[in-house]
Swiss-Prot record:
Family the UniProt entry places it in: To FlaG in other Vibrio species.
Gene source species: Vibrio parahaemolyticus serotype O3:K6 (strain RIMD 2210633)
Gene designation per UniProt: flaG
PANTHER family membership: PROTEIN FLAG
Annotated region (Disordered), positions in chain: 11-51
Biased composition (Polar residues): 11-41
Name assigned to this protein: Protein FlaG
Gene3D superfamilies hit by this protein: FlaG-like
Length: 144
């Protein structure tokens, strides 16, 4: 295998290589770099402090977001309560005993008429029948 001359790693005589450039700058091999009296900091130290500042800023931002989120949630709950009370509607929560499902009912506060129920009564009837048949037949086994 031939290596062409222009791919050689040998540098011509008299050109400065990396070691000579480092020595001219005063940062030779084995000598630690220190900050000068003008306040220059080595790139590694600057990078470390820059990283610390960014981490600290991210933590502070996350804490402020949590405070805002908590305040926003409290405000939203307050607004929802005001809205529900202003439209004279009520909300009831119960557990259907036969099907074992949670039921939410929205009703008119003054008259007690049911406006909406989740899940619907028809679905509750189906769930009750399913529970009754599966208990007797053993076809479906409920696993949690």
């Amino acid at each position: 295998m031939e290596i062409s001359f222009y791919a050689s790693n040998i540098q011509p005589y008299g050109t400065p290589n990396g070691t000579n450039v480092a020595n001219k700058n005063g940062n030779g091999i084995g000598t630690p770099s220190t900050a000068s009296s003008t306040g220059d900091v080595s790139p590694q130290k600057a990078k470390g402090t820059e990283h610390d500042f960014s981490v600290q800023a991210a933590i502070e931002m996350a804490e402020s977001r949590q405070e805002l989120n908590r305040e926003e949630r409290e405000k939203m709950v307050e607004q929802m309560n005001e809205f529900v009370s202003s439209i004279n509607k009520g909300v009831a929560f119960r557990v259907d005993e036969e099907s074992g499902r949670d039921v939410v009912t929205i009703y008119e506060a003054n008259t007690g008429d049911v406006i909406r129920q989740f899940p619907d009564e028809e679905l509750l009837v189906v769930l009750r029948r399913l529970a009754e048949h599966t208990a007797n037949s053993g076809l479906l086994v409920e696993k949690v």
